[in-house]
Regions:
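Short, low-structural-confidence N-terminal segments
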Residues: 1-62, 148-186
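Hydrophobic membrane-targeting alpha-helices
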Residues: 21-25, 80, 129
Length: 186
């Protein structure tokens, strides 16, 4: 007489598959660094913008978390800035990067290859223009309200958000956070 009950292995496999599906539903899509009100910022975009920013400025200490935070802030500030009259074109961003490269002593025109790097520059320009304006306080208050009301999900690989919504870089207890390795003399 054959048993109609599933074997222990099949039950275990089904339970593991169900648990995997449940966990997958709780995490960001693969390759996603963050989503802001449904708009995805991919890990590739963060990596490209970080690399291009380091190449432009020479600042080796710029982290993907800082770039991701800026891209998220830019996603929130841009529509508010445009409405307040602080729209910035791609050409203006490229000119800004050229000026930054020149000020840093670069002899070559900086490569602006990614849309995310343009978005990073757009945020920096808009922020600086708004900061210098008489209506800065009102615009930044509106941006802060937008941030508090936004649906922001951050891949835990990059950061977590604290109660104020600020990004806190993820630190893994099992990864030693010691001094960086010395660079070879050369």
């Amino acid at each position: 007489m054959a048993s109609t009950r599933p074997s222990h292995l099949i039950r275990t496999a089904v339970a593991l598959a169900a648990a995997g599906l449940a966990l997958a539903g709780c995490s960001a899509q693969p390759g996603t660094a963050a989503t802001v009100n449904g708009t995805t910022i991919s890990e590739n975009e963060v990596d490209e913008a970080t690399s291009e920013f380091i190449a432009l400025t020479g600042q080796q200490d710029v982290t993907p978390v800082a770039v991701l935070n800026t891209l998220v802030e830019g996603e929130l500030l841009d529509p508010i800035a445009i409405e307040a009259g602080y729209a910035v074109s791609d050409a203006e961003v490229e000119q800004f990067f050229l000026e930054q490269a020149s000020a840093a002593g670069a002899t070559q025109r900086p490569d602006v290859e990614s849309e995310a790097f343009l978005d990073l520059g757009r945020y920096l320009l808009q922020y600086n223009e708004i900061y210098a304006s008489p209506d800065a306080q009102a615009i930044f208050a509106e941006a802060e309200t937008a941030r508090q009301e936004a649906d922001i999900e951050v891949n835990p690989r990059y950061a977590q958000t604290d109660d104020s919504g600020a990004f806190v870089p993820t630190v893994r207890d099992w990864i030693h956070q010691g001094e960086p390795a010395p660079t070879p003399a050369g």
